[in-house]
């Protein structure tokens, strides 16, 4: 019983599965059938007749025929074949050949995709043929009107084109001939061939229109603008030469003639329709004419500058030469008393030579002006250069004069400083002698003698017949530093000697009861009287006394410096 039930269940499951697959395939077939029917309707709406009525020929007709052939293949072969395949798939599903049915469904879907794409290409191809026909009809009307306007322009403005008119008319005639050929092809329906002719027509027509726009202004400059300017230049040149103007390069008249020839050459280029070459030639002519104007104007402007600056340069030059003469006299006087170390005399002579050269050029320019042979631009350049040179010379003269003007004052100050050094070293000597010391340390004596000899040398050099103030100044700087060091050494010597004496006296109270103080006193006394090492003597006795009486050295030291400061303040008061 259970086995029978199991068989029934399996049979039901298998039946349900078969029905499910059949339902799925039927659904897919219905969807694909709908697509196929839609494509059939779409194919029926494709308007081949409209394009056939255009009366195409040549390559355009071949394109139409190819599109018609493709459409017939879709309608007569491909779409009916899809219908048959869908019927076969339904039969396969009924016979439980589900795998075959599934694979064939995919093939049919792919075939429909291909048909859809092919139909789209056919529609696009037909539209392109229709568009080409419309565009060419429009081009025929547009170009015909354009050529009429061009011919009107050439007829009404033929004088504006000069020698170019004949070739412009020839080009227009050629374009009209090509246009007639294009019109014939377009009317005959051979739009492929017509399109090639149209492309060339557009290019050539654009070139002609550009030439028609560019030539009139070029020709106008050549027949009126430039000749008028050359006439003005020639007249201006004659007037300037009559007023005794001269130019750096006497090439204005030849250049005017050369420009007239350049104008003729450019007109010939226009006659050959070499418009770009003629345009470039006009730019070159314009620059050359502008240059001639600039040359003439430069001389006119330069004359105004020369008239204004001639007297100024003369006065400036005279002033500089007088200043240099006075400076040379002053340097000769100072050289009798001082050594001039910075080449002042030689530099002043060089300045004098520069002034002579400036004067020579200036006089030559004045002569040229007087004899009416002046090139004013050259003279104006000379004046500008001379003004800069004279300013530089004046600055150097001032610097030289400033450098030597203080020599006398520096000498006087050096004498005063020498006297102060002499007074100070004698004061130091008296200060040390008043200490009544048994002697002085050798290093101190040596340094004192060095400073004393430096002062003696300075005294000797400053009283020479010819003084080298640079050397005197260097000596003053050295002595100033050495004198400061000597004062410091003297102060240290005095402090050590006086405090050593005070501590030796103070130590007497401890010598009897303290043997170390007794020994230190003997050693300190020996250093004081025999070797004159007062600093060491102070150190020895101070160390010993501080051991038996801590703080005693500090008290004596503080008292000493307090008294020293009080004495200094009293002296200053």
Curated annotation (Swiss-Prot):
Residues 1-2 are extracellular. Residues 22-573 are cytoplasmic. It is a single-pass membrane protein. It is found in: Cell membrane. Its main location: membrane. Residues 100-188, 317-364, 416-488 form a coiled coil. The keyword Oxidoreductase does not apply. It comes from the Bacteria. HAMAP family: EzrA (MF_00728). Belongs to the EzrA family. NCBIfam families: PRK04778.1-3. This is Septation ring formation regulator EzrA. It comes from Lactiplantibacillus plantarum (strain ATCC BAA-793 / NCIMB 8826 / WCFS1). The gene is ezrA.
């Amino acid at each position: 019983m259970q086995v029978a039930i199991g068989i029934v269940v399996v049979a039901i499951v298998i039946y349900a599965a078969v029905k499910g697959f059949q339902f799925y395939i039927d659904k897919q077939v219905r969807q694909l059938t709908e697509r196929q029917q839609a494509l059939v309707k779409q194919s029926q709406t494709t308007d081949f007749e409209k394009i056939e009525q255009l009366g195409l020929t040549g390559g355009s007709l071949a394109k139409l025929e190819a599109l018609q052939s493709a459409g017939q293949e879709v309608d007569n072969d491909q779409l009916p074949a899809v219908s048959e395949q869908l019927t076969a798939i339904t039969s396969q599903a009924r016979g439980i050949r589900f795998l075959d049915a599934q694979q064939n469904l995919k093939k049919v879907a792919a075939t429909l995709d291909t048909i859809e794409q092919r139909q789209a290409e056919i529609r696009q191809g037909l539209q392109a043929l229709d568009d080409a026909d419309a565009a060419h009809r429009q081009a025929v009307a547009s170009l015909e009107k354009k050529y009429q306007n061009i011919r009107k322009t050439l007829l009404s403005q033929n004088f504006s084109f000069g020698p170019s008119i004949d070739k412009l008319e020839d080009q227009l005639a050629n374009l009209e001939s090509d246009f007639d050929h294009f019109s014939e092809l377009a009317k005959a329906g051979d739009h492929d061939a017509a399109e090639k002719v149209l492309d060339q027509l557009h290019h050539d027509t654009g070139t002609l229109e550009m030439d028609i726009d560019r030539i009139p202004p070029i020709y106008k400059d050549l027949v009126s603008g430039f000749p008028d300017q050359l006439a003005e230049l020639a007249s201006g040149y004659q007037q300037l030469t009559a007023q005794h103007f001269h130019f750096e390069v006497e090439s204005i008249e030849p250049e005017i003639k050369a420009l007239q020839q350049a104008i003729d050459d450019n007109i010939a280029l226009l006659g050959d329709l070499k418009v770009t070459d003629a345009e470039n030639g006009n730019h070159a002519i314009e620059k050359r004419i502008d240059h001639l104007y600039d040359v003439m104007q430069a001389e006119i402007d330069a004359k105004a500058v020369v008239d204004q600056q001639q007297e100024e340069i003369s006065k400036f030059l005279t002033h500089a030469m007088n200043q240099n003469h006075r400076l040379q006299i002053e340097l000769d006087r100072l050289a009798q008393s001082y050594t001039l170390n910075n080449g002042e005399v030689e530099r002043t002579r060089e300045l004098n030579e520069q002034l002579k050269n400036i004067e020579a050029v200036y006089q030559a320019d004045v002569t040229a002006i007087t004899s009416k042979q002046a090139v004013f631009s050259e003279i104006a350049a000379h004046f500008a250069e001379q003004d800069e040179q004279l300013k530089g010379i004046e600055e150097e003269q001032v610097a030289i004069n400033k450098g030597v003007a203080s020599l006398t004052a520096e000498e006087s100050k050096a004498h005063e400083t020498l006297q102060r050094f002499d007074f100070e070293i004698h004061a130091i000597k008296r200060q040390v002698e008043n200490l009544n010391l048994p002697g002085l340390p050798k290093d101190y004596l040596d340094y004192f003698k060095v400073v004393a000899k430096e002062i003696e040398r300075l005294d000797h050099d400053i009283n020479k017949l010819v003084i080298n103030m640079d050397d005197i100044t260097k000596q003053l700087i050295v002595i100033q530093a050495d004198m400061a060091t000597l004062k410091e050494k003297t102060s240290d010597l005095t402090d050590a000697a006086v405090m050593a004496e005070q501590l030796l006296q103070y130590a007497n109270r401890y010598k009897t009861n303290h043997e170390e103080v007794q020994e230190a006193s003997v050693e300190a006394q020996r250093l004081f009287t025999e070797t004159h090492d007062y600093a060491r003597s102070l150190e020895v006795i101070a160390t010993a006394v501080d051991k038996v009486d801590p703080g005693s050295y500090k008290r004596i030291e503080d008292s000493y410096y307090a008294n020293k400061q009080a004495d200094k303040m009293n002296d200053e008061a």
